[in-house]
Every structure is written in C-alpha cells, then in structure tokens.
Amino acid sequence: MRVQGLGLPILVFPIALSALAAQSELRKQSDAHQMFLLRDALSRRPRSSDFYVGEVACAFNKSSTCEETFQKVLAVEPKPSVAKRMHEMLAAVALREGRYRRALQEIDALLLVDPNDSDAKGSRPLIEVLSHFPDQAVQGASKASVQMDDGKLPLLINGTRASYFFDSGANLSTLSESDALRFGMEIQEPKSGGVSTDISGNRVSFGVAVAKSLVLGGIELRNVAFLVVGNEQQPFVDMEPGQRGLIGLPVLRAFGSMTWTRDGVFEADRSPATSNLSAANICFDDLYLITQASFERHALPFVLDTGAATSELWPKFAGVARDLVRKSGTHESHTVIGMGGNQKFEATLLPKVVLNLGGMSAALQPAHILKTQQRDAGKWFYGNLGIDLLRQAQSVTINFKTMTLQLYNAIDRRMRRE
C-alpha cells in the first residue's frame, strides 16, 4: 500500500510540471510583448489564466472582452505588478478609442497602485485635459472614398478644408499651432507642461486641442483630440496652411478599415466584418500598431508606421540577420528624421532585405539596421516599417475590424477581378 501511495506523486508531478512550464511560457511571451506568440499559445491552452486572455483581447481590438476579463482579475486583488499592467493596458485601450474620461480613470487607478510610476505621471496631465471633453464619436456614412493629394487626405476640420497625412505611428493626431487657430480650436496647456518624444527620441513640447468635427467624405468624427506643436516643428514648417497636421491612430481605428491605392484613392469602411483571431497579422501594443512580417524563416513583430517616410530596422533584427550582416553589411552613419529634428545613429547598411508583409514580398533596398536602441519599443520589436515599404504594393488595406494587413500587387488585383 505504501508503495502504491508513493507512486501517486510520480503520476501527478509531470502534470504539475507541465502546467508550470505552460504558465512560464505564457509569462515569457507576455513580458516580451510577443502578442502573436501569446495568441497562438492560448489557442492550444483554452483554460489559461484570465490575465493572458484579457491581454490578448486588448491587443487584438476585442475591447469588451478585454475590459470584462480584466475586471474579473482585478476583483480578486492581484499582485501590484499585475494590477499595474492591466490598468496600463486599459488606459491604452480607452485612449485608442477616444474615451478620455475612462483613460484618466485607469491612469489614476494605476497611480494608486504605484504613485511613482513615471510613465503614468508623465501622461496624466495630457489625459486630464482631454477628460474634460466629450468622448470621440463617429457618425454619418458607413463608407467613404476620396482622392488623396500626394498622400494627404482631404478633410473638413470644424468646417474648414484641410489636407493631412495619415500616420498609424502617431498616438494622437497632431497639428501646428497655426492650423489649430485656423480651425478655431482652443489650445490648452497641460499642467507641468506637455512633452512627447518623436521617432528618434527627441523631446517635443505640445499643447492640446479638440476638434468638434472632422469629416472624411461622408464619415464624421466628433471630439477628435490633437496634440498642438509649434509652427517651427518638422515636418510642418515647410508646409502650406491647412496642411500642417496628421491624423493619428484613434481616428484611423474609428474608420474601421482603410484601403489606399498607388493611384491615390483612399477608402474607409466602417461596415461590420467577421474576424478570425488566428488569421490576424496586426495587433496593438498599448499605443503602437504592430504587424507580423517574415524574414527568411523568422516571423517577427514590427511597428507599422504609415507616417514614416523610410523604414528602419532595429538592433534586434541584427540577431536574426547575422549571416547577412556578416556577408554584406557595412558601417554607416544613418540620419533619422523626426518631428523634433534630425538625429544621426550608428548603423549597419545592407544592400537589400526582403520581408514578407501582408501576403506580399517587399524589399528594403538598401536597409538600415540601427545599432542603438532609440526607444522602449526597440526592446520588443525588430524595426519600424514605413510608407516606403508599403508603397511597393498596388493597394494596401489595414482593417481594424479583422486586425489584418493586406498588400496587393498589380497581379493580385487582376486575379481578384477575374
């Protein structure tokens, strides 16, 4: 009998060890912001921790599931580090959707857990200003089709014509002080001063303003938040009045799905669509839009930034392209252009890097691998993919309802018509 009793732990122990290993894998992917891997792991383990279920829901634009799941976890008073991360994600979800008061509530809840959190303390003055405005809302037509002007969208902002770039790498829409006044917007200064950082890590001072109305075709958004920067800021300083701005992630997400073509047609479509989580190849990492691209045999996450004129690869990419770097890489000093000015970085120049992105092969020719990490996203992601890569396609679709990126070349479009 005692021998049989001693045998019981031998049967149970591997099962317990397997469960611990599974949780360890999920935690590793979560800590490394690897949402595509975490999604795939959860599909194999449907009874996993609610925290990871909620995290994946947040990342793949399932806001209701994200919030409901996290509220269940918060109700049992999790560890402070877990509670902080949930409030951080919930604040990002709210800000992406233009729910300003809810974003402030989550920031304040985070600061109750950790009053010294520098990111929350830094972003609170901005969000506090926005919380006094009604939430962003969308109305009007479900679809719009417009002709772009050299990549800029024809808009009406508070009834006045504007022509703005669209920038998936911008946490919030941004415009110059002169354009804000042109549109009759009241500029407010956050307490303690507003400071943000551009793609190069340069500090940029800003005010805050909210447009009562922003119209694209027949689609109207109300209460759209803008950061307001000085008239001397790049790239606005050399632009004409009415063109000194860009449309950021909360507006683009509200469009539902957006498609643009090489001949300048831009379409937005808010119609309902059925999503398939396993097929999603874009996700959110807080206020970053992330896409998965393949290099050789590696599936890698990158920041997707339609506002970047040129793509840059980050230090992590050098690790997976080690052979290519050794064979054909040369040293260079590479200039990165940001709103706060130009900055030079030590980099490795490669003649060509081919990525499979959104179902199509596209080449960075040449490719620049920065040797130093510019911002926190460089810890988790392999580069910043810009419009130079996307414009190699005949048409591009970013669909926030299905969380997919699709690139089509001329052959693909002809085949679709057939």
Locate each region found by the language model.
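Pepsin/retropepsin-fold aspartyl endopeptidases
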Residues: 19-418
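N-terminal secretory signal peptides that target proteins for export/translocation
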Residues: 1-4
